[in-house]
Amino acid sequence: MEEDKRWIVVPTWRVPGRMEKWHSLVKYLKYKTKDLEKVCYVPHHKVGWAWWTCSRVIFPLKGNSHLEIQAYWNLTPEKGWLSSYSVRITWYTEKFWTDVTPDCADVLIHSTYFPCFTAGEVRRAIRGEKLLSCCNYPRAHRAQVPSLQFLALVVVQQNDRPQRDSTTRKQRRRDYRRGLRLAKQDSRSHKQRSSESPTPRTYFPGVAEVLEILA
């Protein structure tokens, strides 16, 4: 007797294009800038038996928890949609796990990765001094109710330091473009040189923007 086919239904977010942009940016931030050095990137040929999985990116978080972004491909092959992609975003803790939205994923990632304003920046802004830190993950704050202190720091960062801010934005654009070009180069080996000067912190545009997720 032939066994009926069993289906496992999970919530996913559809991605309109291919996954090279996401993979290249993760590898660039992991191996080059070291912003995501602790992140585990698992390509499709190392996933194992899960042939429908394109990649797995695991973000270790604080408090013995982690966030996993798992990309799927070869969706609905019976309809010929072999070029369709989607991602599943899951948050794991010691006692439970749950699927989360891209906005929630941004908040979780920013809690561990990419620097933000330090506690002393408010006092520096009140005294009219230059800010010594900035937020490199502004997308993570869109899902939250911002405090007056945070809004004030954003305004100071944008208006009070035009020359430095312009340089920072140019550096962010260069870092982002370099990360995206890694997909075309298909570079799988990354050399780590201790004699090189540390690379400046990289701006991260957000999970939904990089993946171009269709809500």
Curated annotation (Swiss-Prot):
It is a peripheral membrane protein. Residues 154-167 are annotated as: Multimerization. Residues 169-181 have a biased composition (Basic residues). The modification Phosphoserine is found at S147. It comes from the Viruses. It holds the Pfam family Vif. This is Virion infectivity factor. It comes from Human immunodeficiency virus type 2 subtype A (isolate ROD).
